[in-house]
Amino acid sequence: MDTKKIFKHIPWVILGIIGAFCLAVVALRRGEHISALWIVVASVSVYLVAYRYYSLYIAQKVMKLDPTRATPAVINNDGLNYVPTNRYVLFGHHFAAIAGAGPLVGPVLAAQMGYLPGTLWLLAGVVLAGAVQDFMVLFISSRRNGASLGEMIKEEMGPVPGTIALFGCFLIMIIILAVLALIVVKALAESPWGVFTVCSTVPIALFMGIYMRFIRPGRVGEVSVIGIVLLVASIYFGGVIAHDPYWGPALTFKDTTITFALIGYAFVSALLPVWLILAPRDYLATFLKIGVIVGLALGIVVLNPELKMPAMTQYIDGTGPLWKGALFPFLFITIACGAVSGFHALISSGTTPKLLANETDARFIGYGAMLMESFVAIMALVAASIIEPGLYFAMNTPPAGLGITMPNLHEMGGENAPIIMAQLKDVTAHAAATVSSWGFVISPEQILQTAKDIGEPSVLNRAGGAPTLAVGIAHVFHKVLPMADMGFWYHFGILFEALFILTALDAGTRSGRFMLQDLLGNFIPFLKKTDSLVAGIIGTAGCVGLWGYLLYQGVVDPLGGVKSLWPLFGISNQMLAAVALVLGTVVLIKMKRTQYIWVTVVPAVWLLICTTWALGLKLFSTNPQMEGFFYMASQYKEKIANGTDLTAQQIANMNHIVVNNYTNAGLSILFLIVVYSIIFYGFKTWLAVRNSDKRTDKETPYVPIPEGGVKISSHH
């Protein structure tokens, strides 16, 4: 090996050593507080080294990417669905589609176990599993004309597993959408500032869509500046309106009202043309997403804050107040999207491969965008770990866990305001005492002061992770840019997350509608027509109706639906990732590259162990701490049967809990059947092709890139 080659690797070796040293500090320092900077530097080093070496190994050895091969976008260039797109524009488009609420919420919830377990899983998971899955699916789909995950399973393994996979993907999509919507509802309930700001984004996006289409076509920079100025104005005026004696109470809505508004919004937006609301919303969201995360990272570099949360808390045994479940397997399910997420397999097949200009871009987009998303998750974990742990637990523990009943903040503007303020003080004192007794000392004054700082009546009962992240963002941005108060930055954070999530809700409902039309089209061919308005309305109504039902159940559930839906969301999401990795393994076997299947088999096996174990516990555990579905249902049925002095409301609440648990149990069993039947068919396929010495995969024939090169579009 010549010296030139060796010298080329020296900077990377140094970077690797720096990363390893920072990780060692994060992992091994005990008892003293350390700076959040260690985590940021360690993560960036890990991402860069993994991208430089591991993703290159996969691209060159496992996939053998071919720069001379024409992609589906080049072959079918129709200016509509198939468009060869600039790799940086496509990176932004793909990142906006995959980075929903998962990387924001999961890590915040996982912080109840301390910052260390989450950090290690986010780094190891993304390098070995998450980015591999995204890259693999994108590669396979781009060699099959941009086929969707279900279609590829049908082609490579047969029609039965194909239909099962389509059905499974659709079910998982419904759960993901319900969870995303629930997070928006929790963030906007009883918050007039949030409601005004988030509602303003709809006319802003519509205006941007019309501006780009008719007034000044193609002026992306111009319209983005206008959009951002209008966004900032809407945050500022939201604060003015929230403190207005008339408009404040008028825009304070209960969670059920917001639920119905969201369902209506999603239904309409999924039927509107893409250019009108979805595309401009994506632009706004991508600017905001990458801007805020980079801003947060720079803020942490400037402020060098210390991590207040311990490296590991006492809750690794599964007794935590936010969610139940021990470190293994539940940490690996709570943090889905930053480490590995099956939802991405639905984006990496279907949409993104139809826009790929050159096959070699798949590494940058498939592997690279997932690393970026993992960084978003790391920043969320850091934001949750630099605020006071006592405040973190007070905000995220459901009221029942704190032993309190929240007063009706709805009447804050009315004549009962003094009574409600007094009740709020009592409740806060009780909550502070409870959290302090767990070893995370906090005073009622600190909790009330935080609420006052951020311009909200209270910070209690703010589960779902979004408000905690917004407080973390507000802490950092307010210290770096003190001219705007904490309230502005907090609502900026909430808006950032709601936009993040609404983008996913819009896009998800739209692809959910296509999936449902695909499924139903097998029985009623007319419904397959995506350009028919009637079929579109039926598909959208079915999709929105299903996630809307789960969302409503979650909102009215006194135990907080996110608690029951979140583990299901994590488990189903990881199962879908396992299915995608099984497909990757089958394709490698059929391509006669069996020596490389460890790349997909190792993460697939790990995900299957985690998800099956977690589902087994959630279904059959009789440990009251675990809140197993069947156990909880039987407990509440018993309470209803034996309860003599129960009010009608209590009985209705208990019946809700019983229905929720049976729904979740039914869905869990369905997922197990879906995943294991696909593994069975994968195994069957392997047995069928193992003795053939020719390739048996269904790759489309090689077409060379046209001689004049490819005309690349820089906007999509």
Curated annotation (Swiss-Prot):
Protein's GO biological process: cellular response to nutrient levels; cellular response to starvation; DNA damage response; plasma membrane pyruvate transport
Membrane disposition: Multi-pass membrane protein
pH-activity profile: Optimum pH is 7.5.
Subcellular locations according to the entry: Cell inner membrane
Molecular function terms from GO: pyruvate secondary active transmembrane transporter activity; symporter activity
Periplasmic topological domain residue ranges: 27-30, 110-119, 185-191, 244-257, 304-326, 396-484, 553-568, 618-668
UniProt key word Transport: yes
TM region(s), chain numbering: 6-26, 31-51, 89-109, 120-140, 164-184, 192-212, 223-243, 258-278, 283-303, 327-347, 375-395, 485-505, 532-552, 569-589, 597-617, 669-689
Means of activity regulation: Transport is inhibited by the protonophores 2,4-dinitrophenol (DNP) and carbonyl cyanide m-chlorophenyl hydrazone (CCCP), but not by ionophores such as valinomycin, nonactin and nigericin.
Short name of any one Pfam family annotated for the protein: CstA
Residue ranges, Cytoplasmic side: 1-5, 52-88, 141-163, 213-222, 279-282, 348-374, 506-531, 590-596, 690-716
Coiled coil: none
GO CC list: plasma membrane
Annotated function: Transports pyruvate with a high affinity and specificity. The process is driven by the proton motive force. Under nutrient limiting conditions, mediates the uptake of pyruvate, thus enabling it to be used as a carbon source for the growth and survival. Part of a nutrient-sensing regulatory network composed of the two-component regulatory systems BtsS/BtsR and YpdA/YpdB, and their respective target proteins, BtsT and YhjX.
Subunit architecture: Interacts with BtsS and YpdA.
Protein known as: Pyruvate/proton symporter BtsT
Lineage: Bacteria, Pseudomonadati, Pseudomonadota, Gammaproteobacteria, Enterobacterales
